[in-house]
Design a protein with these regions (language model features):
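Extended alpha-helical targeting/anchoring segments
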Residues: 1-173
Length: 173
């Protein structure tokens, strides 16, 4: 196990991913949205004191590690952006979709949340199959997988709500 998280740049991240991939070794990767701060490491080497992940079938949460106490009551007040701010971003996305620059977009926006919970408490108690906590810097939790590797191929799947609702079995899919 490494003692501390070691982030690298885009080129080194690509090199590390190619190396692990060519050797058939599983690896964990985390990349910021501009690919300047990247983490590429074998899962068993990640220090659980700085990064925890819990995915179906893969986790580095030590067995028997106690969860943080769940407070009986807590403050959780989302502070979403205004409709006007959201609309400006949506209009940009819409313009680019119609311009042919993309065919699928996951338009997400940061939402501040005023809470008295720690990020670790959010990680421990989130009811989501995909969870990540990074050194009290941020936490991620999601109900869905976005990409899947099967038989050497990478597949992306539309998120719920993006399927054509007119398909005969849309509700079941």
């Amino acid at each position: 196990m490494i003692d501390t998280l070691s982030f690298c740049g885009r080129e080194e991240a690509i090199t590390r991913m190619n190396c692990f991939g060519s050797e058939g070794r599983p690896f964990f990767f985390l990349i910021d949205y501009i690919a300047e701060k990247c983490l590429v490491e074998e899962p068993h080497r990640l220090p659980s004191s700085e990064l925890l992940f819990a995915f179906p079938g893969a986790t580095n949460v030590p067995q028997g590690m106690p969860a943080t106490p769940h407070p009986r009551s807590f403050r959780w007040e989302p502070c979403p952006m205004s409709f006007e701010e959201y609309r400006r971003g949506f209009d940009i996305v819409h313009r680019h979709l119609h311009g042919g620059n993309s065919f699928l977009v996951n338009y997400t926006c940061a939402t501040l949340v005023d809470t008295d919970l720690t990020l670790r408490q959010v990680f421990d108690h989130a009811r989501a199959p995909y969870r990540l906590w990074v050194n009290d810097s941020f936490v991620v939790f999601s109900p869905e997988i976005f990409v899947r590797i099967t038989d050497g191929f990478i597949y992306s799947h539309p998120m719920k709500g993006t399927m054509d609702a007119t398909l005969p079995d849309a509700r079941e899919r």
